């Protein structure tokens, strides 16, 4: 994608903006764990538990579940060396791999690590859990963990042209999906139709318009609940 493309986003600049904010707040390494942080900096969707280690300078490194690492690397602008997969077994789990990565960025073993801690009404927000926080704190004894999610929140508030254009195109595609469903349900078409069929009609119409992925907000439950998933 070139700079002249209407959907172009300068992701390396976003990383540098985060690094400039890190420097201003005396943060040596930033550990992103929220879905919004990963999407905003990677240009890839990470449905599995994932993390992004951002050094004070240079490229960040993403860590995701090994079965999805190749796909994330393919979707993201980062090269394969900066998208790694973890396995939930000793020495290869996310705590071990990420701690090793952070230690390499802090040669003297000391520094300030920005983390994302908080609460949300959104289940897969991605804030560090208490277990993760405690494990990172134990694995990095010379490192001070500080809450820093406001860095990304502040920077992401201002939308660039590529982001605005992506929102507009996504909205247009959704309108097509709604129209297809409305037409299918009109004049008694809803009779005998299940919620999953309705969801499929919307997905099919949107895919034909260029959609590459659809994910219902609660993971599928709102189009697969109760008796409506079968013929009524």
Set out the residue ranges of the language-model regions:
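Active-site pocket-lining segments that scaffold enzyme catalytic pockets across diverse folds
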Residues: 171-183, 194-203
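Short catalytic-site patches enriched in acidic/histidine residues
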Residues: 38-50, 149-153, 158, 189-232
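Contiguous, non-catalytic segments that form substrate-binding/exosite surfaces or channel walls
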Residues: 186
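A composition/biophysics-driven feature that prefers long, compositionally simple stretches
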Residues: 1-177
């Amino acid at each position: 994608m070139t700079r002249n493309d209407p959907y172009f986003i300068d992701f390396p600049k976003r990383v540098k903006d985060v690094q400039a904010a890190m420097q201003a707040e005396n943060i040596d390494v930033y550990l992103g764990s929220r879905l919004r942080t990963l999407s905003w900096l990677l240009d890839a969707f990470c449905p599995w538990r994932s993390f992004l280690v951002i050094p004070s300078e240079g490229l960040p490194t993403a860590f995701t579940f090994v079965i999805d690492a190749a796909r994330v690397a393919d979707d993201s602008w980062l090269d394969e060396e900066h998208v790694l997969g973890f396995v939930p077994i000793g020495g290869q789990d996310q705590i071990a791999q990420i701690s090793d990565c952070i230690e390499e960025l802090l040669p003297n073993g000391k520094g300030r690590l920005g983390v994302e801690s908080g609460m949300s009404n959104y289940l897969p927000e991605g804030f560090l859990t208490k277990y993760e926080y405690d494990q990172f704190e134990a694995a990095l004894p010379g490192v001070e963990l500080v809450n820093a999610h406001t860095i990304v929140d502040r920077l992401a508030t201002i939308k660039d042209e590529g982001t605005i254009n992506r929102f507009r195109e996504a909205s247009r595609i959704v309108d097509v999906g709604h129209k297809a469903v409305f037409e299918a349900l009109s004049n008694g078409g809803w009779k005998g139709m299940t919620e999953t069929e309705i969801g499929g009609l919307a997905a099919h119409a949107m895919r034909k318009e260029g959609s590459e992925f659809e994910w219902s907000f609660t993971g599928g439950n709102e189009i697969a609940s109760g008796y409506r998933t079968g013929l009524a």
